[in-house]
């Protein structure tokens, strides 16, 4: 079963919580920060990120950066003493900041 949520930034905490519980979610993004990859209100299928999930540059992920939830791209990955750190940003060159893997809750597997 795929849960369905509307992504609206800070309020998208519920989607992150469901992903942390292992649920695959259909999330509808609002805004133009990811155009032309994603259009506003275009749904995606987001799977939970687990220890086995491979994260790469250009993956679209649901994550939390500085208290806000984003459906944005991984722009860069750097090794750290405890794993890796991921630079999150939109599709227009704005960088939100670096996060640890524990702040990445889901990965987009399909754009609908």
Language-model segment annotations:
Residues 1-112:
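Extended hydrophobic leader/signal-anchor segments used for secretion and membrane insertion
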């Amino acid at each position: 079963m795929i849960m369905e949520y509307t992504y609206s930034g800070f309020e998208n905490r519920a989607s992150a919580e469901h992903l942390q519980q292992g649920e695959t979610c259909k999330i509808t993004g609002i805004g133009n920060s990811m155009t032309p990859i994603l259009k506003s209100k275009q749904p995606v299928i987001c799977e939970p990120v687990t220890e086995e999930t491979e994260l790469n540059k250009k993956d679209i992920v649901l994550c939390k950066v500085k208290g806000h939830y984003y459906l944005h791209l991984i722009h860069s990955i750097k090794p750290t003493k405890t794993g890796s750190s991921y630079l999150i940003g939109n599709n227009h060159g704005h960088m939100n900041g670096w996060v640890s893997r524990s702040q990445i809750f889901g990965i987009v597997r399909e754009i609908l």
